């Protein structure tokens, strides 16, 4: 049985008296690519923010690597996020005054890693992600796809326990979307745990495990196994399952 790296029990969250999450139980296995799907307003991003410690739930407990993180102070939680979690958002989160290369190397030093080693690993990442030609450009001077690939590099450079991705391709065209998804699939194949929120079936196909969220409740779960490009049966299986959930 796979080790559970992140666990949530009884997670509930309300905004202005409206329940967004209600009594959610969820396990994230180490090395998995878990996708949380659901329609707009289902509570997907709220659940991701709760699990990552970005927004505390009203009720419930969250454990990371077997230890409770629910009662950590904001300072402790900030340190944990900086050292253990990587984040990719729909809107590209990069420091505007730093070059793409500097954005990634600064993030890589969060664990007080050797600077020379971080630079070497960043160079390898930029080669792998086809960013070497724009490494010295500011975020404002590159395309959306290039910026988001740099954001992926920034998220993984410190070898985080989990990469949290909230609609990471929502602002990209199909070509750039596939480029970012290929990167996420690649790091997952190397053993990285990924938790991604999406409303797009094309993106969800990259996951090996799909959780369907509806009106603040987990309605179903589907195991897809490893991703295989152009797998028609995989696509049909996910499509049929989503239809059964009321998608």
Which role fits each region the language model picked out?
Residues 60-68:
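Conserved ABC transporter NBD signature motif
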Residues 82, 137-140, 158, 190:
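Conserved signature/switch motifs of ABC ATPase nucleotide-binding domains
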Residues 68, 105, 116-133:
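Conserved ABC ATPase "signature" region
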Residues 52:
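Helix-to-loop junction immediately C-terminal to a conserved catalytic motif
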Residues 138-142, 146-148:
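Conserved ABC ATPase signature
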Residues 163-166:
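Catalytic Walker B motif of ABC-type/P-loop ATPase nucleotide-binding domains
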Residues 131, 135, 155-156:
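ABC ATPase C-loop
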Residues 98-107:
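Short coil-to-helix segment of the ABC ATPase nucleotide-binding domain corresponding to the Q-loop/switch region
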């Amino acid at each position: 049985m796979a080790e559970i790296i992140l666990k949530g029990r009884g997670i509930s969250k309300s905004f202005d008296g409206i329940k967004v999450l209600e009594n959610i139980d969820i396990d994230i296995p180490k090395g998995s690519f878990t996708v949380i799907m659901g329609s707009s307003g289902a509570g997907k991003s709220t659940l991701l923010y709760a699990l990552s410690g970005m927004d505390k739930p009203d009720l419930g407990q969250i454990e990371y690597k077997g230890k409770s993180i629910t009662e950590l102070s904001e300072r402790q939680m900030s340190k944990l996020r900086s050292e253990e979690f990587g984040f990719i958002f729909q809107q590209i989160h990069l420091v505007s005054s730093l070059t793409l290369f500097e954005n990634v190397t600064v993030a890589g030093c969060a664990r007080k890693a050797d600077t020379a080693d971080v630079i070497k690993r960043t160079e390898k990442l930029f080669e792998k992600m086809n960013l070497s030609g724009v490494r010295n450009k500011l975020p404002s001077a590159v395309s959306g796809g290039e910026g988001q690939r740099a954001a992926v590099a920034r998220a993984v450079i410190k070898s985080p326990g989990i990469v949290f991705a909230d609609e990471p391709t929502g602002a990209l065209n199909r070509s750039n979307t596939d480029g970012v998804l290929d990167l996420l699939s690649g790091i997952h194949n190397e053993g990285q745990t990924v938790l991604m929120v999406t409303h797009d079936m094309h993106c969800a196909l990259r996951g090996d495990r799909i959780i369907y969220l509806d009106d603040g409740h987990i309605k179903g779960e589907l195991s897809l196994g490893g991703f295989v490009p152009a797998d028609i049966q995989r696509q049909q299986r996910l499509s049929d399952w989503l239809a059964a959930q009321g998608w």
